Every structure is written in structure tokens, then in C-alpha cells.
């Protein structure tokens, strides 16, 4: 096993080199001016016309031979410079850093129902083999396998935010809404009195003693957590049920 893993690890640099080289050559088929657009984050930077464009092409090395550009890209990659993200309007590293806390928070809260519910319902389903609860959980796992995540997310948003919350606004105020916080909570978090210790809103709200903000953040996490965890929960439940049936 160790020898197999070692061989695979030896091939990893070759695979990475080949994959990045192919993608780089594909991008090279674009016009240099089209590739230059990735380096421009403000149209005012191009007021100089074609002369300014040519100057920027030389500045970023886009007129160099492809192998020189690739070597420069690898050198920047090795130094931690992953380039500019047009989507994030910042460096790639900056975009990752800005979005990582929200991603980590969502992953942490999604992990709990995946493990807890899958183990509990897997055991319950196996103990009640071919009974109603077993058939119900099997239907849930089939739905979890077959339903795309983006479809589930849109359906939950339509049902709970579009119907339930709008029908009972006083009962579900701040729940099921898109985003990470309500407007009032976002203003409080952006204030100078609120200290961002970790970037995780639930943790930071608790550390700041802002329990209303914590409750609001949890209410906004419900639908994303269900959407993210359902497919993994269904897969783990199925494995747990099969293992328990073999044991019993």
C-alpha cells in the first residue's frame, strides 16, 4: 500500500505540470488584449488608448513567448502570487481570505447534522428493517442522491423564504433570508464596537456578547446548512444502514 501511494505521489508533479501547461496553452489562444483585460480593474486605466494598452502588455509580459510567460507564472505561483480575480475584484489570495471565514462557518455547521443524523437514522433504519421508518429513510437517501444541490437550495429558498417567512413574518423574523445577516445586524457588525476575532459571525457574536446577532446568524445558516449537508448525509446514512444490517 505504501509503495502504491509513493508511486502516485511521484506522478503528482508530472500531472500538475501537464494539466497547468495544457490550460495555459489554451489561454494563450486568446488575443493578448483579451488576456490584458484580466489585469485591468478600472476602465480609467486605459485612457491612453492603444499606446497605453501596448505599454501594459509589455509590463505584464503578455508579448513574451509562451514558454517565458509560463515560466513567469510558475515563479509567481511558487512565491504565493496566484494572480488577480476579476470576480472578487482583488488578488486571488485576497479573495480566498475574504471568503474563507463564511465557507468555514458553513462547513462546520453542516458537518454536525451529517454525522449525527446519519449515524442515528442509519442505526434506526437498520433496527427497523423493512418497516415504515426504514422505507422513509431509504426514500430520503434516494432523494438526496438524485436531487442536485442547486435545485434543493432554490426549492428551500422558495418554500421557506418565499412562503413560510412571508406568511408568518413575526414568527420567523430574520430566519431563512439570503445572505449572512439581516440589515440591522450587518450594521452592528460593521460598527467599531464589534470586534472580529475569527471572521465566523456566530463565534464573533458570542465573543462580543451580541446574542441577537448570534441568533440572526444562525437563522440565516439554516437553509445553506440543509442544502449543503443533505447529499452527504444521505450517502453516509446509506453506508451506516448497510453496515448495521451486516452486523445484525
Language model regions located:
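Juxtamembrane loop-helix boundary motifs flanking transmembrane segments in multi-pass membrane proteins
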Residues: 1, 48, 62, 66, ...
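Helix-terminus/capping and membrane-interface signal
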Residues: 1, 12-30, 102, 106, ...
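Alpha-helical transmembrane segments of integral membrane proteins
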Residues: 2-3, 100-101, 105, 109-133, ...
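Transmembrane-helix boundary motif in ABC transporter permease subunits
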Residues: 2-4, 24, 28, 86, ...
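N-terminal signal-anchor/signal peptide hydrophobic helix marking the start
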Residues: 6-12
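Hydrophobic alpha-helical transmembrane segments of membrane transport/permease proteins
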Residues: 15-71, 160-208
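An internal, D/E-rich "acidic patch" concept
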Residues: 60-119
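Residue-level signal for discrete positions within transmembrane alpha-helices
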Residues: 99, 103, 139-142, 146
Amino acid at each position: 500500500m505504501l509503495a502504491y501511494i509513493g508511486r502516485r505521489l511521484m506522478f503528482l508533479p508530472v500531472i500538475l505540470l501537464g494539466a497547468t501547461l495544457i490550460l495555459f496553452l489554451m489561454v494563450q489562444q486568446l488575443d493578448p488584449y483579451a488576456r490584458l483585460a484580466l489585469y485591468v480593474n478600472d476602465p480609467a486605466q486605459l485612457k491612453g488608448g492603444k499606446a497605453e494598452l501596448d505599454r501594459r502588455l509589455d509590463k505584464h509580459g503578455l508579448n513574451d513567448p509562451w514558454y517565458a510567460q509560463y515560466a513567469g507564472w510558475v515563479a509567481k505561483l511558487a512565491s504565493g502570487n496566484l494572480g488577480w480575480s476579476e470576480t472578487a475584484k482583488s488578488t486571488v489570495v485576497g479573495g480566498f481570505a475574504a471568503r474563507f471565514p463564511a465557507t468555514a462557518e458553513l462547513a462546520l455547521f453542516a458537518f454536525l447534522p451529517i454525522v449525527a443524523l446519519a449515524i442515528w437514522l442509519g442505526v434506526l433504519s437498520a433496527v427497523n428493517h423493512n418497516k415504515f421508518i426504514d422505507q422513509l429513510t431509504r426514500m430520503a437517501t434516494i432523494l438526496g442522491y438524485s436531487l442536485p444541490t442547486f435545485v434543493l437550495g432554490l426549492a428551500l429558498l422558495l418554500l421557506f423564504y418565499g412562503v413560510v417567512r412571508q406568511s408568518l413574518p413575526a414568527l420567523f423574523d430574520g430566519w431563512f433570508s439570503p445572505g449572512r445577516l439581516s440589515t440591522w445586524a450587518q450594521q452592528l457588525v460593521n460598527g467599531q464596537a464589534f470586534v472580529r476575532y475569527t471572521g465566523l459571525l456566530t463565534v464573533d457574536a458570542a465573543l462580543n456578547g451580541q446574542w441577537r446577532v448570534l441568533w440572526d446568524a444562525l437563522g440565516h445558516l439554516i437553509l445553506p446548512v440543509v442544502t449543503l449537508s443533505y447529499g452527504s448525509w444521505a450517502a453516509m446514512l446509506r453506508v451506516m444502514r448497510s453496515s448495521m444490517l451486516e452486523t445484525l
